[in-house]
């Protein structure tokens, strides 16, 4: 049964490729995660079938998204957000550690 409310202390804590993350709400088709980054964390260029929408709570990050018509290379700061379509190559580098909230649709089994 799907959990409607997840209290802070109930969040499932995981480590994925050296990054600490909390699996927060998990719905039927999507999930919310809180990524806890430290300076030097990175994700090399990769793709996954999940749409990924994120909100930068704190820290500074370099996001690269390889769109066919125009590649994007941008610095993200607190308050910025992004939406990466599924199966789109992208990479992520942590400049200053902090927290990012990500929503994945469908949910990522490797984060559960």
Predicted regions and their residues:
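Short hydrophobic/aromatic-rich beta-strand segments that constitute the beta-sheet cores
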Residues: 33-34, 63, 102
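Glycine- and acidic-residue-biased ligand/ion/polar-headgroup-sensing regions
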Residues: 50-66
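Short acidic-glycine-tyrosine-enriched beta hairpin
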Residues: 68-86
């Amino acid at each position: 049964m799907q959990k409607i409310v997840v209290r802070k202390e109930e969040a499932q804590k995981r480590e994925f490729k050296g990054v600490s993350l909390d699996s927060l709400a998990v719905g039927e088709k999507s999930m919310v995660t809180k990524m806890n980054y430290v300076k030097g964390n990175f994700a090399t260029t990769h793709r996954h079938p999940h749409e990924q929408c994120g909100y930068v709570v704190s820290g500074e990050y370099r996001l690269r998204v390889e769109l066919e018509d125009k590649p994007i290379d941008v610095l993200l700061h607190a308050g910025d957000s992004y939406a990466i379509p599924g199966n789109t190559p992208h990479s992520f580098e942590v400049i200053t550690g902090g927290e990012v909230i990500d929503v994945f649709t469908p949910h990522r089994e490797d984060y559960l």
